[in-house]
Amino acid sequence: MVGEEKMSLRNRLSKSRENPEEDEDQRNPAKESLETPSNGRIDIKQLIAKKIKLTAEAEELKPFFMKEVGSHFDDFVTNLIEKSASLDNGGCALTTFSVLEGEKNNHRAKDLRAPPEQGKIFIARRSLLDELLEVDHIRTIYHMFIALLILFILSTLVVDYIDEGRLVLEFSLLSYAFGKFPTVVWTWWIMFLSTFSVPYFLFQHWATGYSKSSHPLIRSLFHGFLFMIFQIGVLGFGPTYVVLAYTLPPASRFIIIFEQIRFVMKAHSFVRENVPRVLNSAKEKSSTVPIPTVNQYLYFLFAPTLIYRDSYPRNPTVRWGYVAMKFAQVFGCFFYVYYIFERLCAPLFRNIKQEPFSARVLVLCVFNSILPGVLILFLTFFAFLHCWLNAFAEMLRFGDRMFYKDWWNSTSYSNYYRTWNVVVHDWLYYYAYKDFLWFFSKRFKSAAMLAVFAVSAVVHEYALAVCLSFFYPVLFVLFMFFGMAFNFIVNDSRKKPIWNVLMWTSLFLGNGVLLCFYSQEWYARQHCPLKNPTFLDYVRPRSWTCRYVF
């Protein structure tokens, strides 16, 4: 190879000596365009035409070049992740990537889904938005949202100054939404301490005596029954009772209910992942019982994942500046949502004239609610799934930051459900979908998917009903019926861009419907209260019969 390179180099040198004029022309390709006519002036039109031609050729080659580079880069990253996973997970990773081997044509197979018996594989990786925000074009979109927030603030200040004759720097809506916060704090501490102690104690007590017990089945049923009582009674009814008994405002209720659901899912994952290990240990008659340490369980309770592991990939250091920035962005999103409600939502519903509930009022309300609904959707995603989870991941040096994927590129609802919230999807996939198939049969995949949709829809509707103090199953209908239908109709076989457009259109419309219906019902119950409401009054829509001015 070296000899061939030397010979080719000598041939080129000899040819350059034989044809010095040709070599000179090759080294000066612009000489022809810069030749001056007899009058000594450069032909500007010819120079501009040459430049335009070169620019057009470069633009024509640009997409092919970017596509080729992107393809090779995806291959490189995929191979690198495979090698890293094989080093970290041994045989488990080999099994996983043998499944992915059949997807060679898919260069973006980033979910690294392990077989059900192996569970989720955690790999150190950054969040997608952290990578995208390093690109100037994407960062400009982020700057546009900041500029829009500044305009919201200026608009509020100007309107208040014109109406009141002074600057009104009040956040009455924000202070009302997060009212009675001390109750939230002590309720959270009770939930945390009970989740930290009861599941771990029950599991430890069951595991240490399981192999020596003369009645292991009765022992397992007894401890399982106690665990169910804790999940349903303590974590289930306890926080709900506090929320209703102390009449907490909406945002304070949301914090408690969200943490309630999170602790229930965490406790279930801890028991679900460790019970099979104890059973296998007893089956193999091992002298040691695989019981996690208290520190491992405590770390899991704060880690931004719902899948328990004894250890996770960890980053070497904590970037406290990064943590501060993420928390600042979370608070910025809170104020952003406040100004959206103050400038877009409140005037919309306050200015609806006194007229009965009709299709005309409903249609106008839905389409006027699309813009604020979509903005709230984006801000919720950015504040929680990106900023909040990344802040805790950085403080805990948690390495796997794939809390979401590129859901905005989805051409099907099935892909959207998988990529919008990876944290919750992983829990539903392994502990609801896969366990359903294991318990019944692998032939009932449609029934398993239906069960997962039902569980998710019921939990979402429960959270909204408790937080808003009324039952109005709009989200349940959209999620359980339309969402499930779209999941089967607009499936993964849809790859054309038009399906991405349709997905975004339906997503925009759905958020407008949710914001319109729930806001109308909220204002109706505020302005048309009942003296002695019965249970049916909490589930009967008040906005359909109440005539009032918002």
UniProtKB/Swiss-Prot annotation:
> Which reaction equations make up its catalytic activity?
a sterol + a long-chain fatty acyl-CoA = a long-chain 3-hydroxysterol ester + CoA; cholesterol + an acyl-CoA = a cholesterol ester + CoA; cholesterol + (9Z)-octadecenoyl-CoA = cholesteryl (9Z-octadecenoate) + CoA; cholesterol + hexadecanoyl-CoA = cholesteryl hexadecanoate + CoA
Membrane topology, from the record: Multi-pass membrane protein
Q: Which residues carry this modification: Phosphoserine?
A: S8
Impact reported for Y518F? Loss of enzymatic activity
Q: Which cysteines are joined by disulfide bonds?
A: C528-C546
Q: Name one GO molecular function term.
A: sterol O-acyltransferase activity
- Which residue positions are annotated as catalytic? H460
What happens on changing S269L? No expression nor activity
User: According to its UniProt record, where is this protein located?
Assistant: Endoplasmic reticulum membrane
Does the record bear Translocase in its keywords?
no
Motif, FYXDWWN motif: chain positions: 403-409
Regions crossing the membrane:
139-160, 181-206, 219-244, 253-276, 320-352, 370-395, 444-468, 475-490, 497-528
Taxonomically, which superkingdom?
Answer: Eukaryota
Residue ranges of the region described as Disordered: 1-39
The effect of R262A is: Strongly reduced cholesterol O-acyltransferase activity
Q: Which residues carry this modification: N-acetylmethionine?
A: M1
Biological processes per GO annotation = cholesterol efflux; cholesterol homeostasis; cholesterol metabolic process; cholesterol storage; low-density lipoprotein particle clearance; macrophage derived foam cell differentiation; positive regulation of amyloid precursor protein biosynthetic process; very-low-density lipoprotein particle assembly
Its EC number is: 2.3.1.26
Q: Which residues are listed for cholesterol binding in this entry?
A: H137
As for what it does, the entry says:
Catalyzes the formation of fatty acid-cholesterol esters, which are less soluble in membranes than cholesterol. Plays a role in lipoprotein assembly and dietary cholesterol absorption. Preferentially utilizes oleoyl-CoA ((9Z)-octadecenoyl-CoA) as a substrate: shows a higher activity towards an acyl-CoA substrate with a double bond at the delta-9 position (9Z) than towards saturated acyl-CoA or an unsaturated acyl-CoA with a double bond at the delta-7 (7Z) or delta-11 (11Z) positions.
Provide the family line. Answer: Belongs to the membrane-bound acyltransferase family. Sterol o-acyltransferase subfamily.
- Name this polypeptide is given: Sterol O-acyltransferase 1
Q: Which organism is it from?
A: Homo sapiens (Human)
What's the name of its gene? SOAT1
